[in-house]
Amino acid sequence: MVQKKRLEEHFDEKLFIAEMKAKSKQEALEELVDVLAESGKIRDKSLILEMLERREALGSTGIGNGVAIPHGRSLAANQIMVVFGKSSKGVEFDSMDDAPVNLFFLILAPPQDRANQYLPFLGKVVELIKDSAVRSRLAEVESYEDFLAVLSEGQSDE
């Protein structure tokens, strides 16, 4: 039997932004992608940014309640990669509810996801952040350890 990965196993301390500097949607996307590049996870930032901008043109990934989940598949990704960023001030992101975004989950996956983890992972993130208590606790995290604790507590054991 294949063991399902818990959410926190997809995250990396190098891909955690305790306080984002971005003031606009474009700056937020750039800041999230910059972290991927600085960590050595990707080489071509422009390729990822173009893909994210195309995805945003189809409809905002600002899903409401202060959360955005920019996501997509790219040849630049050889596995699922996730960047978490928090903005205390909030960023205008053309969200479905027109509210500023405080919590960002950038999710990238390879074009061919043999393990079929991408969509289930995306679903797990959405399920987790539906809980207003989890969103509130994520908005307060100041360290990667705090972040992991909230993720772990917010998941039901399957």
Please provide the spans of the model-predicted regions.
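Cytosolic covalent-transfer regions centered on His/Cys nucleophiles
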Residues: 1-158
